[in-house]
């Protein structure tokens, strides 16, 4: 391997948290090269970020630097960080530098790939408008996902991004014939652990990997240094790109893209860069573009990516979520006000968008029903001030009817999740697109005006709502 041949040795000159300065004799490693040393008996990888002159480089550490001392020897590998790729990754968990962390022995790799790859060229890219059915009513109706597209789940703290991404994994990855890659970027270790065991229990993966496993996991969780969190998304993407290049349709889940930006901003200040708006790194758009442009569908295969994006203080104009918007085909916005009403998934039907909601793609009926639902909800929203001040009695008969239908639609957009079954006790529901359209069409046309609001809350298809209404009537009698 070329990396072994270069083995030029330098010495640690300075350690400032996650940033380490290394000086070489008459050699200067290239930017993004991986340098290796040992720290407390463990392999420590440093990535070159800056040239400081006089053969000194400033590096970002991929693991804790506690115990690292000045004068310690560091070897230049002569190549960027490389990670194992191939079918041997399925069912396994690796970290940012490709080491297995699931205590199941070494990873069986076909080849080693650099985590820094160029984005596919214009001619290699492929665009095909096809819908990805999720079985979640609000998504399929109002902001349908594209096969081979990029989907962002935006939401503040605790409104249900991770639960929604886990439900999508449950509904799509389990039914999906191809492979999935999950990148845990700076999120809770507990959730990563739960997901790993959930995959084994549901048969998506076999314990210890190997034949029959369909998902690869790449983790760099909250407790990791910023270097690992800033690069683990690229590691996951490299694994996904390999499967795509083999002609697979890959699902790539990232939780959470904001932590990638946050890690970049943590190391940016230590590297001496002048911060930009709100203290973020000046290279925010470049970093995001370098990651997002690689997540794309080529003529060889497709990558459909679902990314959870944390919204700091529920402010969608914050530079981190705002930079992500430009790269996405569909945006699903989770709203705290909807979560407070107890409506889950707390998707904002008026704030979520998709370029697939086009009559040429979804068909005239679907498009007309979706727009009608949105117009009823928008009318209800504009009437809320009047209702708050004057009460319902001051509304016209037509407006009263609109409000009644809107409240039913709002409740019918909720749905019990499979992954939340343990918390709610309600069995999860998958709703077919045709049933979703039929149900909302009936609601908009007033076919269900005689049913109570409560009948539409946390049900699957419209038949269930009718059954629930009959049950409620029988209980009340």
Swiss-Prot record:
SUPFAM superfamilies in UniProt: C-terminal domain of alpha and beta subunits of F1 ATP synthase, N-terminal domain of alpha and beta subunits of F1 ATP synthase, P-loop containing nucleoside triphosphate hydrolases
Name of a matching Pfam family: ATP-synt_VA_C
EC numbers: 7.1.2.2
SMART domains in the cross-refs: AAA
Name of the gene this protein is made from: atpD
Topology of this chain in the membrane: Peripheral membrane protein
Originating organism: Mesorhizobium japonicum (strain LMG 29417 / CECT 9101 / MAFF 303099) (Mesorhizobium loti (strain MAFF 303099))
NCBIfam families: atpD
Residue stretches spanning the membrane: none
Identification of the protein by name: ATP synthase subunit beta
Recorded family membership: Belongs to the ATPase alpha/beta chains family.
Chain residues that bind ATP: 155-162
């Amino acid at each position: 391997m070329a990396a072994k041949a270069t083995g030029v040795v330098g010495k640690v000159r300075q350690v400032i948290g996650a940033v380490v300065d290394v000086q070489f004799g008459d050699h200067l490693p290239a930017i993004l090269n991986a340098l290796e040393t040992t720290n407390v008996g463990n392999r420590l990888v440093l990535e070159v970020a800056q040239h400081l002159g006089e053969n000194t480089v400033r590096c970002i550490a991929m693991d804790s630097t506690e115990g690292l001392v000045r004068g310690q020897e560091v070897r230049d590998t002569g190549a960027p960080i490389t990670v194992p790729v191939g079918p041997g990754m399925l069912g396994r968990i690796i970290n940012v530098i490709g080491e297995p962390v699931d205590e199941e022995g070494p990873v069986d790799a076909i080849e080693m790939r650099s985590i820094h790859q160029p984005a596919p060229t214009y001619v290699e890219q492929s665009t095909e408008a096809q819908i990805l059915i999720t079985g979640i009513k609000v998504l399929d109706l109002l902001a349908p996902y594209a096969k081979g597209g990029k989907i962002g789940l935006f939401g503040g703290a605790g409104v249900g991004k991770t639960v929604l991404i886990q439900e999508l994994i449950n509904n799509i990855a389990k039914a999906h014939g191809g492979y999935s890659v999950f990148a845990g970027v700076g999120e809770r270790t507990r959730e990563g652990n739960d997901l790993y065991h959930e995959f084994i229990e549901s048969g998506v993966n076999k314990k210890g990997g190997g034949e029959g496993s369909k998902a690869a996991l790449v983790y760099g969780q909250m407790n990791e240094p910023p270097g690992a969190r800033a690069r683990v998304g690229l590691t996951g993407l490299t694994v996904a790109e390999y499967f795509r290049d083999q002609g697979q349709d890959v699902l790539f889940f990232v939780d959470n893209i904001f932590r990638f930006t946050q890690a970049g901003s943590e190391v940016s200040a230590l590297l001496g860069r002048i911060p930009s708006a709100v203290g973020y790194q000046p290279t925010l758009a470049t970093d995001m573009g370098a990651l997002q442009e690689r997540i794309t569908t080529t003529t060889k295969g497709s990558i459909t990516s679902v990314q959870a994006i944390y919204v700091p203080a529920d402010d969608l104009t914050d530079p981190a979520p705002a930079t992500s918007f430009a790269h996405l085909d569909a945006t699903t916005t989770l709203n705290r006000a909807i979560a407070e009403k107890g409506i889950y998934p707390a998707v904002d039907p008026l704030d979520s968008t998709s370029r697939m909601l086009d009559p040429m793609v979804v068909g005239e009926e679907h498009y007309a029903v979706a727009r009608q639902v949105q117009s009823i909800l928008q009318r209800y929203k504009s009437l809320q001030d009047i209702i708050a001040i004057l009460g319902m009695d001051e509304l016209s008969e037509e407006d009263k009817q609109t409000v009644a239908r809107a409240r039913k639609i709002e409740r019918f957009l909720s749905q019990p999740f499979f992954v939340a079954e343990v918390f709610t006790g309600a069995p999860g529901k998958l709703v077919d697109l045709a049933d979703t359209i039929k149900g909302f069409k009936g609601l908009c046309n007033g076919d269900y005006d005689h049913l109570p609001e409560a009948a539409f809350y946390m049900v699957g298809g419209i038949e269930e709502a009718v059954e629930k209404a009959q049950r409620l009537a029988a209980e009340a009698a």
